[in-house]
C-alpha cells in the first residue's frame, strides 16, 4: 500500500524503489539542470521538479516518508533573487543553492572557463579576461532592470513571510507597515551597485539572471555561441568529468 504523501503517487513509488540518495532539482527531464546535476552527483537519483517552490515542497514531502525508507532527500535550487535569510532557512531543511544566479552561469565561472579553454584550444588567460569583461559590461548595462527584478522578488519574499491570524484583516497601509520597503530597496541597490563598482565577477555571477548570457560567449573559445553550453555539458558528462566537477561543485552551497 502506498502511503499518503504530497508527492505524486507515481513519483513516490519510483523513489521508494530507488537505493540512491534523492536529489530534487529545478528544470524538466530535458533541461540542462538534470544533465548537469546527474554528472556532478553520479551517486544521486536526480529528480527534476520544475520550479524552486516545487523542489522545496518535494524535499519536505519525501523526507516526511522516512518511516518507509532510510534514504534522505535534499535539493539544489538556483539562487535567483533570494535573500541570504531565505537561503539560510532553506539550507536548514536540506535545500542548498547555487552561488551563481542560474545553473547556466556555472559555465561562466573562472574555473570552468579555464578548464574548457584548454579543451577548445583557446588561451585560458585571454579567454577568461574577455568573458569577464563582457559579462561585467553587460551586467552594468542591465543593472537597472536587474535591480528592479530583485526588488520585486525581495518584496514578494517579505510579504510571503507575513503571518495573519484568523480574525485579522490587513489593509494596504497595514501591510506597508509590516515591511520596510525603503530598507529593502536600499539593500538591493547597494549590493548591485557595489558589485558593478568593484567589478566583482563572482558576485555578479551570483546576481545576474539572464539565460541568454551563456549562449553569447562561445566565440571567445573559438566555437559557435549556440553550441557552447551543450559542448560544455557533454564534456562534464564525459572526458572532463573530474576536472569540471571539481571546478563546479565549489559553486554549490553546503
Locations of the language-model features?
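C-terminal accessory helical subdomains adjacent to catalytic cores in phosphodiester-
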Residues: 84, 90-254
Amino acid at each position: 500500500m502506498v502511503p499518503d504523501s504530497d508527492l505524486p503517487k507515481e513519483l513516490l513509488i519510483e523513489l521508494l524503489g530507488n537505493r540512491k540518495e534523492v536529489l530534487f532539482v529545478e528544470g524538466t527531464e530535458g533541461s540542462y539542470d538534470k544533465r548537469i546535476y546527474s554528472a556532478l552527483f553520479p551517486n544521486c537519483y536526480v529528480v527534476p521538479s520544475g520550479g524552486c517552490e516545487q523542489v522545496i515542497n518535494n524535499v519536505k514531502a519525501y523526507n516526511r516518508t522516512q518511516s518507509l525508507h532510510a534514504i534522505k532527500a535534499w535539493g539544489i535550487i538556483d539562487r535567483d533573487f533570494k535573500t541570504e535569510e531565505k537561503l539560510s532557512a532553506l539550507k536548514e531543511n536540506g535545500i542548498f543553492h547555487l552561488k551563481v544566479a542560474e545553473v547556466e552561469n556555472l559555465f561562466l565561472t573562472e574555473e570552468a572557463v579555464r578548464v574548457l579553454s584548454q579543451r577548445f584550444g583557446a588561451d585560458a588567460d585571454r579567454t577568461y579576461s574577455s568573458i569577464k569583461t563582457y559579462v561585467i559590461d553587460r551586467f552594468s548595462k542591465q543593472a537597472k532592470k536587474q535591480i528592479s527584478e530583485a526588488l520585486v522578488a525581495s518584496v514578494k519574499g517579505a510579504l510571503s513571510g507575513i503571518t495573519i491570524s484568523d480574525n485579522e484583516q490587513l489593509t494596504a497601509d497595514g501591510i506597508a507597515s509590516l515591511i520596510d520597503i525603503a530598507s529593502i530597496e536600499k539593500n538591493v541597490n547597494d549590493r548591485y551597485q557595489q558589485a558593478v563598482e568593484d567589478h566583482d565577477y563572482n558576485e555578479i555571477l551570483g546576481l545576474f539572471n539572464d539565460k541568454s548570457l551563456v549562449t553569447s560567449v562561445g566565440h571567445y573559445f573559438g566555437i559557435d555561441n549556440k553550441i557552447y553550453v551543450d559542448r560544455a555539458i557533454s564534456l562534464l558528462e564525459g572526458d572532463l568529468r573530474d576536472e569540471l566537477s571539481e571546478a563546479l561543485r565549489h559553486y554549490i552551497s553546503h
